[in-house]
């Protein structure tokens, strides 16, 4: 941490880029992808085991997770625990209709405010220290924070990647989304 700060101080004349992961969203009150997966597993389990609702409400409880995972494993048609395909598989299984998935993800970010780290990135952008923020998050909080801090976010996604080739002016912050499968738009 201290070496990072020394390097950062030494290079204030060089524009920086930041990569944000799930931790930034979690500090703003948005649940992690891991928790989403377990919520979907719980919903699938409860739709097949209707009389189990009360015990399985707390899907963050380890014994509840073990019980649900045992049931899923015994079905023989679900991905292995912690496998790479769990996220997309369970999102589609829990919400096979794309608009339902969009509504689910929107419900996670609705009324959430960017935590202080987002505001700091915008402040650094105002002082031309940060020029771009790359993110694996679907929440749009860096864009919201840019608006709140009188910056113009230039949103770049996998669908409009050609926008990255542009002259960037002051008061703009490039926000590059590295995901698209279950991203949502809130406008």
What kind of region is each of these model predictions?
Residues 1-187:
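Conserved catalytic-core helix/loop/strand module for nucleotide-ribose chemistry
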């Amino acid at each position: 941490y201290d070496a990072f700060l020394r390097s950062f101080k030494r290079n204030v004349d060089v524009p920086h880029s930041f990569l944000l992961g799930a931790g930034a969203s979690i500090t703003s009150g948005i649940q992690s992808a891991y928790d989403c997966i377990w919520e979907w597993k719980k919903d699938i389990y409860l739709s097949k085991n209707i009389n189990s609702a009360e015990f399985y409400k707390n899907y963050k409880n380890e014994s509840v997770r073990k019980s649900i995972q045992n049931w899923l494993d015994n079905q023989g048609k679900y991905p292995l625990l912690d496998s790479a395909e769990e996220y997309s598989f369970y999102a589609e299984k829990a919400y096979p209709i794309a608009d339902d998935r969009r509504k689910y993800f929107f419900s996670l970010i609705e009324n959430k405010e960017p935590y202080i780290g987002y505001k700091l990135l915008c402040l650094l952008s105002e002082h031309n220290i940060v020029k771009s923020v790359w993110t694996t998050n679907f929440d749009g909080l860096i864009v919201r924070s840019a608006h709140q801090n009188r910056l113009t976010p230039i949103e770049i996604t996998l669908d409009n990647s050609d926008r990255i080739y542009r002259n960037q002016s002051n008061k703009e912050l490039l926000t590059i989304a590295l995901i698209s499968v279950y991203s949502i738009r809130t406008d």
